[in-house]
């Protein structure tokens, strides 16, 4: 009696891990393009690590040479200009995908997979830290003053704040030691991100993906390859196309003009601001006139994502069938867009007042409005069931 042939990808100790994650993974049959952003983030991370390693071969972490070494990469290194443009604009694409991924998680209730969601929020915080220390490396005006302003905020932490700032700076101000430290952090953090991504995927595969209907999909699953692998590749093509188009046509469109000026500690830029993808958090920071309060608000702007699973009161998983919550969700998106714009404006009237209102709305939506709407919609559904007009199935 002949035995069926053994399939190496299913029996090999290492290949079987990849097989269970990328080939034979049971996936809900109805997941849409909004579920592509996880794989797009993996692509962005791989691209950033590759281009970053190439740039690190030519970069010099020294205050006297850092700015010149970046110019040397762009002018003298073969395709160095392309690597630098891909790395700089790749960060923007990275954060676009992150925000879309988080938005999808909020819209479709993916945060109810608490372990996966919490690891994802930690990944977001680590990515933000990586991007911040990377922004300092070219040693332009905005690099220097951004590092000075943001790191100085840590001094607001009671008792230990000043000591932490001194350790970060390696002295009494942002200096050569600071640049060396930041280059070290920027080099090692992406590899920590890659390890955390594996943990994120492991937790996800314990529960399986959610789906656009928000119901249990165990009865209708298909294998990941070839159905969703080709769908992901289509997303890769679009992302790479947009990234190369930006990097080749307007490569500096998303960069800060002041950062093309060599860092000068004696000349403060008229308006210090971070990259565009941090402007919403920077606006929330500036909305509080107190230093410690601003730091707490900045941390809360990201850490509030950890609270969402515990303030979920609706009997439905997502908001795709909840009109009131949908309106609130899109108000949140508009509010974030407004905060992003306000973060790039000077800290003066009327922008300060607008920022304070927008920041209050941001926190109110997560802490108060979403939970209240969840309970209200539960009551409306119960009322409609009692009147016999609709037959609702609320299990997920």
Swiss-Prot record:
Main location as per UniProt = mitochondrion
Residues at which a ubiquinone binds: 205
User: What domain of life does the native source organism fall in?
Assistant: Eukaryota
Report TM segments: 37-57, 81-102, 117-137, 182-202, 230-250, 292-312, 324-344, 351-371
**Entry cofactor note text?**
Binds 2 heme b groups non-covalently.
Q: Which UniProt keywords apply?
A: Electron transport, Heme, Iron, Membrane, Metal-binding, Mitochondrion, Mitochondrion inner membrane, Respiratory chain, Transmembrane, Transmembrane helix, Transport, Ubiquinone
Which cofactor(s) does the record list? heme b
Residues where heme b b562 binds: 87, 186
Which residues does the annotation say bind heme b b566?
A: 101, 200
What Gene3D superfamilies would the database entry show? Cytochrome Bc1 Complex, Chain C
GO MF terms, alphabetically ordered: metal ion binding; ubiquinol-cytochrome-c reductase activity
Identify the GO cellular component terms for this protein. Answer: mitochondrial inner membrane; respiratory chain complex III
Q: What membrane topology is annotated for this entry? A: Multi-pass membrane protein
Q: Where in the cell is it found?
A: Mitochondrion inner membrane
Q: Name one GO biological process term.
A: mitochondrial electron transport, ubiquinol to cytochrome c
Q: Quaternary structure?
A: The cytochrome bc1 complex contains 3 respiratory subunits (MT-CYB, CYC1 and UQCRFS1), 2 core proteins (UQCRC1 and UQCRC2) and probably 6 low-molecular weight proteins.
The protein's role, per its UniProt record:
Component of the ubiquinol-cytochrome c reductase complex (complex III or cytochrome b-c1 complex) that is part of the mitochondrial respiratory chain. The b-c1 complex mediates electron transfer from ubiquinol to cytochrome c. Contributes to the generation of a proton gradient across the mitochondrial membrane that is then used for ATP synthesis.
Q: Which family does it belong to?
A: Belongs to the cytochrome b family.
Miscellaneous section: Heme 1 (or BL or b562) is low-potential and absorbs at about 562 nm, and heme 2 (or BH or b566) is high-potential and absorbs at about 566 nm.
Protein name according to UniProt: Cytochrome b
Q: Which gene encodes it?
A: mt-cyb
